[in-house]
């Protein structure tokens, strides 16, 4: 299966008639493996800061998580494994695997829990596959 199919079929999937606003799978170096057409154009330093928070959980808390120029308030995640951010009625979930970062961005009516489930389920699958 291509990386794009993982984004299209697994991350941008339909849940009760709704889906993520945007999604992507990136390498730890910030290289794009696949992304939805709606995924924001991000800066390399934004991915570097996200990777740093996985190594040093809490490092993004004072500044927020930035992605494509949008600032998300960092909320509880799983240190070294999942970072979650909130902005207004939406937010972002980032799951780290051994080689990739899986991103999901959502807006209401999708809930944070639904976004977490979508992103973390694919991330856990990739981890199980050694990726």
UniProtKB/Swiss-Prot annotation:
Cell compartment(s), UniProt? Cytoplasm, Cytoskeleton
Pfam families per the record?
Profilin (PF00235)
Q: Does the keyword Cytoplasm apply?
A: yes
Keyword annotations: Actin-binding, Allergen, Cytoplasm, Cytoskeleton
Q: Please give the GO cellular component terms listed in this UniProt entry.
A: cell cortex; cytoskeleton
One MF term in the entry's GO annotations:
actin monomer binding
Q: Superkingdom of this entry's organism?
A: Eukaryota
Q: What is its main location?
A: cytoplasm
This protein's assembly is summarised as: Occurs in many kinds of cells as a complex with monomeric actin in a 1:1 ratio.
Q: Return the similarity comment.
A: Belongs to the profilin family.
Q: What does this protein do?
A: Binds to actin and affects the structure of the cytoskeleton. At high concentrations, profilin prevents the polymerization of actin, whereas it enhances it at low concentrations. By binding to PIP2, it inhibits the formation of IP3 and DG.
Name by which UniProt lists this protein:
Profilin
Origin organism lineage: Eukaryota, Viridiplantae, Streptophyta, Embryophyta, Tracheophyta
């Amino acid at each position: 299966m291509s990386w794009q199919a993982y984004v299209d079929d697994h991350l941008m999937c339909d849940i009760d008639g709704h889906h993520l606003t945007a999604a992507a799978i990136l390498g730890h170096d910030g290289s794009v493996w696949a992304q939805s057409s709606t995924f924001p154009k991000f800066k390399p330093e934004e991915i570097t800061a996200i990777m740093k928070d996985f190594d040093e959980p809490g490092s993004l808390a004072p500044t927020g998580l930035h992605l494509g120029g949008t600032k998300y308030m960092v909320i509880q995640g799983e240190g070294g494994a999942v970072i979650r951010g909130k902005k207004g009625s939406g937010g972002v979930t980032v799951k780290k695997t051994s080689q990739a970062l899986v991103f999901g961005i959502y807006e209401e009516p999708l809930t944070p829990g639904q976004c977490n489930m979508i992103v973390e389920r694919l991330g856990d699958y990739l981890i199980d596959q050694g990726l």
